């Protein structure tokens, strides 16, 4: 099988939506029966995003095989059926780390290690490895053309076009075409200069995606084509749109997939986008709306909870409800009290790290439990629900996590000290262990308790969900908590770790140690989020009565 490569770059400004554009194109190609995957190459020097601040970088998306990756991989999985893995995302830091390790080992036989050829060769090797077994691999280059950090990646893909052959490579460049109200027209000069920048490093774009707040007129697209040396049919207008799920149809309507298939000599049927049309229809025709409060630590940057926000929307699609998400800083709950939680139809507490705002989350869990408000706790959201229940129901005054209070009387959440790595080797960790790459992370099997609410929602006895945490329920104190009425609804494969808890005497109170948001998609949704949004709608109706 010959793999075809589409290299996606961005110019003029950042945040043009390269990831969404790449994922949308991948969705069309997949709908044509092609085996497609997507890669994200990040130019920062961190080895991975695992220890980066969520308020700077956004969420860390966890893959099935346990890689901590860029949030764009979440977009990729929500748009195509192919599951991402650690092969789909790497950084400058990872490349340099690998090359330096080989140099120390003597693999280069004493050669002088340089950006060209050693770094660029390592980049090319990883791209080829990531694309193995696929008809088409889209490779998104992070950053903006002209950034110093991106140069080794751009040089690597330039070389790949020569080595793999232009018949199997295509350069797709996203660029900004701004509208100037004073002139009453769109301006193409920024695009021309962005392409000029690409040409200066030896890359001639084959497709231009013109981002604008409006449709770029045909005469302006013709002008761009002429001055940028690109066929007119390969200059695509991508205007701002009210739903990202309309983008596959928008790109297809301009013949982008036909152009690419012809370029790669791929003989495949027309794309059937009926699934995406159904998603757009459900989104545009809700039967009502609910308001869900998300109580978190990183609400200043909604991208820190990108997958949770999208999963809530997917839950809304499955219930024909618009989900209005109210982001609430957990510290506001501490200072202003539970008044900030009034008028919500449900409460969700997502994952997080560190003690700041934890007491506010505990107050929110308490409010949901005592007022029969539907509650979904994820990761830390489960741990705070457990601490709240232990304190106020099970009689464990001051119950806490050893993450926050190491010497507390009732450590209902504690650090797991023994882990097994992907090779089955036991690793011992403590509070002094490195933060990066030292968590229980990736897909883990979970056995659901017969008769539980989650068993009913999933419709399966055994599930696989993705984790990212260091702390777990302390089994030494579990029996006392269960005796007070909390039900363990899911256990790990070895039956040693608590994965899900729920309250049988509450209309809908579920908390899980894993991150269900990472496996939710607009086409399929997710059982927990669908059930949670449904419960929010039921709560709203009860309040009206």
Swiss-Prot record:
Region (Amidoligase domain): 1-266
Ribosomal protein in keyword set: no
EC number: 6.3.4.2
Residues engaged in binding UTP: 14, 187-192, 223
GO molecular function terms attached to this record: ATP binding; CTP synthase activity; glutaminase activity; identical protein binding; metal ion binding
Residue numbers binding ATP: 15-20, 72, 239-241
NCBIfam families hit by this protein: PRK05380.1, PyrG
Family listed: Belongs to the CTP synthase family.
Protein name per Swiss-Prot or TrEMBL: CTP synthase
Lineage, broadest ranks: Bacteria, Pseudomonadati, Pseudomonadota, Gammaproteobacteria, Enterobacterales
Gene: pyrG
